[in-house]
Amino acid sequence: MAKFIYPTDTTRVTSGFRGSRPDHHGIDLAESGYHPIYAAASGRVSRSYISSSYGECIMIVHTIDGVTWETVYAHMRSGSRTVKEGDYVTQGQTIGVMGNTGDSSGQHLHFELHKGSWNINKSNAVNPLDYLGKGDGGGTTEPSDKPLQPKGLGIATSKYPEGWGINLYS
């Protein structure tokens, strides 16, 4: 079983890892309404801040089986962050609410997973869909042969030219 859980209650992927946007180093999970954001695994908050691009953002460092991972949760609802730098969080703990802050064109969670520490070049980014599952069952952090599949992939539409912004699928 995967060591990382889905960071929100929707698995609707509106923009995948890289794909048509090679500089998109995470996945976008989106759905209208109120959606809490959860820590994908237990760890220590490395950053909890407001970024011009990520908006309301939290980064968490995890050490799993001696390996360092870092998760990024971006575009959270204004004022919804419930943790600060240095806090220890447990897997599934609510850390905020899905929103539309920063460089964003609609409510969604931009979620990144890095094998190693996050860096500005995002050279450690891996596709989160290869590692997400239903929880910590003492298994592995290696990609699953059959990762939990997202719902909602369809035809992409975007208000931005050349694929900029999040893609909304119908």
Model-derived regions: residue spans:
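Short histidine-centered loop motifs in beta-beta connectors
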Residues: 32, 38, 48, 67-92, ...
